[in-house]
Amino acid sequence: MKVILKKDVKKLGKKGDVVSVSDGYARNYLIPRGLAEEATRGNITQLKEKEKIKEKKHQQKIEEARDMASKLEKEKFVIKVKSGENGRLFGSVTTKDIAETVKKAGYKIDKRKIDLDDNIKALGTYRVPVKIFEDVVATLKIQVVEA
């Protein structure tokens, strides 16, 4: 019997897979526990429709991320901090500070997506990569100036 998996099942497949199993396994275990449904023409058509919608939403998110990345790369973000002699900062500029500055400019970025190797500890201009969505990366221009 062919079934469509509703959830991931160990040693059988992932959600959405169409697999062949014995009739007893399907009727007595998979279907009653809500792990699968019988693979009828209607159910398979419905599954394909859901996959198309999911792919369309995914493409839309990628497009939005690319649009946001291009907007972010055009802007220059200024962070004002106190500094001592020779342009050394009191403290440092962290991913949290960068995320807050970007948020003030009207963009929402998670601080964990900012790829800062080491905290910024001196005045100057820096290029900081940010992972927007999957493989969409924007490079922010951060200028650290004295307050």
From Swiss-Prot:
UniProt-listed Pfam families: Ribosomal_L9_C, Ribosomal_L9_N
InterPro entries hit by this protein: Ribosomal_bL9, Ribosomal_bL9/RNase_H1_N, Ribosomal_bL9_bac/chp, Ribosomal_bL9_C, Ribosomal_bL9_C_sf, Ribosomal_bL9_N, Ribosomal_bL9_N_sf
Keyword Transferase: no
Keywords annotated in UniProt: Ribonucleoprotein, Ribosomal protein, RNA-binding, rRNA-binding
GO cellular component: ribonucleoprotein complex; ribosome
Paired cysteines (S-S): none
GO molecular function, one term: rRNA binding
Alphabetical GO biological process terms: translation
Keyword Ribonucleoprotein: yes
Protein purpose: Binds to the 23S rRNA.
Family: Belongs to the bacterial ribosomal protein bL9 family.
Name assigned to this protein: Large ribosomal subunit protein bL9
